[in-house]
């Protein structure tokens, strides 16, 4: 099992380089991804041990902030967030390896994107370790372009159909349900793919699906960035982007499993919260004007079948 974990780690660290390089090619000022390598001290008082590399870009003309973060951690006991639905895992040691990214563009017409790909192994030090993969990618637009959502979902469907034709409808629905703010009765964006507890096939089959899915993120996102990054925008557009970013913050702090897992397990706070946008605003009881561009996004982000 250790060999398989290391193989996935090698894939993720190379993917991190591929993604940061591709995004930098669209940046028009001197902003670059900066590498922040870290290691948790291996001491008895540390609940979580391990290492990682958080790559951050800030202050770009295209990307106001972005993080592409790799981590490999292990602990003696899974935190409550990881065992809430799987009580049989309570008390087991674990290894978790993953890559998580969030890109916050400056231009309000370029959507925010998020992706995450990970493996968990519970009881890795036992004769019968339990493994599963999780991950996916989702898109959060501030202004609606239907062709962008169609391209995003078509890319997701193509990669799913290559492995299992039941995956896209199942993981698309799961994504719509997961990235939902209950207290707002709103979806975070137009979705994409979300899956967890993936071990329905052999390890190699699941590994191949997850790595193909991860490699398709750039195919899904870069064409949208290229198409929208030079659209002129006003302060009104920027203000609405900042307001909608507030929803992103609310979801990450209240509902996101990765954030909750990281904080409960004693993870590296600076890396866990690096996905937060650089700026966000809240306005009391604000409502968009009827028929405005801003109102349209509330219909646009409702779950629908994007691929006819």
Swiss-Prot record:
GO terms for molecular function: coproporphyrinogen oxidase activity; metal ion binding; protein homodimerization activity. SUPFAM superfamilies: Coproporphyrinogen III oxidase. Its cofactor is a divalent metal cation. This is Oxygen-dependent coproporphyrinogen-III oxidase. The gene is hemF. Involved in the heme biosynthesis. Catalyzes the aerobic oxidative decarboxylation of propionate groups of rings A and B of coproporphyrinogen-III to yield the vinyl groups in protoporphyrinogen-IX. The keyword Oxidoreductase applies. The record marks 183 as: Important for dimerization. It is found in: Cytoplasm. Homodimer. Its EC number is 1.3.3.3. Keywords: Cytoplasm, Heme biosynthesis, Metal-binding, Oxidoreductase, Porphyrin biosynthesis. Belongs to the aerobic coproporphyrinogen-III oxidase family.
């Amino acid at each position: 099992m250790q060999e398989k974990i290391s193989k996935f780690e090698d894939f993720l660290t190379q993917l991190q380089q591929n993604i940061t390089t591709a995004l930098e090619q669209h940046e028009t000022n001197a902003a670059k991804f900066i590498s922040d390598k870290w290691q948790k001290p291996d001491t008895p008082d540390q609940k979580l041990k391990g290492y990682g590399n958080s790559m951050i870009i800030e202050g770009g003309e295209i990307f106001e902030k972005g993080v592409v973060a790799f981590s490999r951690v292990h602990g003696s006991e899974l935190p409550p967030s990881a065992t809430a639905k799987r009580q049989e895992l309570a008390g087991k040691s674990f290894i978790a390896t993953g890559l998580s990214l969030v890109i916050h563009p400056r231009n309000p017409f370029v959507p925010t994107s998020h992706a995450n790909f990970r493996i968990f192994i519970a009881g890795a030090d036992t004769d019968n370790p339990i493994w599963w993969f999780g991950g996916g990618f989702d898109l959060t637009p501030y202004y609606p372009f239907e062709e962008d959502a169609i391209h995003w979902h078509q890319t997701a469907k193509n990669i799913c159909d290559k492995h299992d034709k039941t995956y896209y409808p199942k993981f698309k629905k799961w994504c719509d349900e997961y990235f939902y703010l209950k207290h707002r009765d709103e979806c975070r964006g137009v979705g994409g793919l979300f899956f967890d507890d993936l071990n329905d096939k052999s390890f190699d089959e699941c590994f191949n699906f997850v790595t193909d899915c991860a490699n398709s993120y750039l195919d899904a996102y870069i064409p949208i960035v290229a198409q929208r990054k030079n659209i002129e925008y006003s302060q009104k557009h920027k203000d609405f982007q900042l307001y909608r970013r507030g929803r992103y913050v609310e979801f990450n702090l209240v509902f996101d499993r990765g954030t909750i897992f990281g904080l409960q397990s004693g993870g590296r706070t600076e890396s866990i919260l690096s996905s937060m946008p650089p700026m966000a605003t809240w306005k009391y009881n604000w409502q968009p004007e009827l028929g405005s561009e801003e109102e349209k996004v509330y219909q646009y982000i409702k779950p629908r079948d994007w691929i006819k």
